[in-house]
């Protein structure tokens, strides 16, 4: 019989479990927060599939980096994945602007091509590529505490995976604050942005670069498929609660905490994979927001602003 109290305290019953699970929770929070902040602008631009495209598009970059270096060390993998992610984004933008293809068709064509190329390269036996496709797709956040320790100037500084994700999360937050107005205006009205002298193309590629960095940093923990859930669920859920984009952005932090803690306890209770449990928790939180949210919920009469409807009435600050 299910016991709620036992389910909640089982994950924290010993000192070792507390240390182990805190690392998993912090990793989940940073992944979800980073993906959610970027996802706010991706969803506003009606390009939710872009996260999925870049997530799949980084696979050939990872494999090629391994084939060239024979190592899965952080540096080569990040460089290869970022180049592949930017290449995927550039291909999508080129197809969208230079051909009659719609955005969804351009993204679908590009990410399937990149992902297929990655699978073909992964199947090659050159150098005995020790990459598990299941790990790339689904990740294993539960192994975060086993990551190598970061050593600087001979001093141990803690879990390297947490440091890597922490730096990316910090960069994402700083970029969101510094470039907020540019991202907002270019997301809702590119004509206005051009009339104000904003470099629309540079901002678009900058967002793709940030997206690629977040995806690369996250794929080992939650896998490329679940990155999309972490990227879409926070902004979409909070859009039913708030009418202003700054509030939607701020809500990403408490939602990330709920996803991470809720997913961990769900995994302990049902013996599910932790990363999938975090995504399920996100869906469970989304449902009441969608049904009863004050900003366009199914059972409310207020009109939904915002993140789904474009630029009507959205304040810039």
Show which residues each predicted segment covers.
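Transmembrane helix-bundle core of multi-pass membrane transporters
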Residues: 115-175
């Amino acid at each position: 019989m299910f016991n709620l109290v036992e389910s909640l305290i089982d994950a924290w019953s010993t000192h070792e479990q507390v240390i182990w699970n805190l690392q998993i929770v912090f990793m989940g929070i940073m992944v979800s927060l980073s993906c959610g902040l970027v996802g706010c602008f991706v969803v506003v631009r009606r390009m939710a599939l872009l996260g999925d495209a870049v997530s799949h598009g980084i696979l050939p970059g990872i494999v090629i980096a391994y084939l060239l270096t024979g190592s899965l060390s952080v540096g080569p993998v990040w460089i290869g994945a970022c180049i592949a992610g930017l290449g995927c984004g550039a291909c999508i933008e080129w197809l969208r602007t230079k051909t009659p293809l719609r955005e969804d068709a351009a993204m679908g064509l590009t990410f399937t091509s990149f992902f297929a190329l990655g699978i073909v390269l992964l199947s090659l036996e050159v150098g005995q590529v020790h990459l598990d496709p299941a790990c790339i797709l689904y990740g294993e956040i539960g192994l975060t505490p086993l990551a190598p320790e970061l050593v600087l100037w001979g001093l141990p500084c803690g879990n390297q995976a947490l440091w890597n994700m922490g730096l990316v999360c910090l960069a994402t937050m700083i970029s969101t604050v510094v470039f907020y107005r540019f991202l907002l205006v270019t997301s809702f009205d590119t004509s206005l942005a051009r009339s104000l002298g904003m470099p629309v193309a540079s901002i678009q590629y900058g967002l793709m670069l940030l997206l690629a960095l977040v995806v690369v940093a996250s794929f080992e923990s939650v896998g490329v498929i679940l990155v999309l859930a972490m990227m879409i669920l926070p902004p979409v859920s909070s859009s039913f609660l708030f009418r202003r984009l700054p509030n939607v952005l701020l809500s990403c932090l408490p939602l990330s905490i709920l996803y991470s803690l809720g997913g961990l306890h769900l995994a302990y209770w049902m013996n599910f994979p932790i990363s999938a449990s975090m995504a399920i928790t996100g869906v469970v939180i989304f449902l009441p927001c969608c049904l009863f949210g004050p900003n366009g919920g199914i059972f409310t009469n207020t009109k939904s602003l915002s993140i789904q409807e474009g630029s009507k009435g959205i304040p810039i600050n």
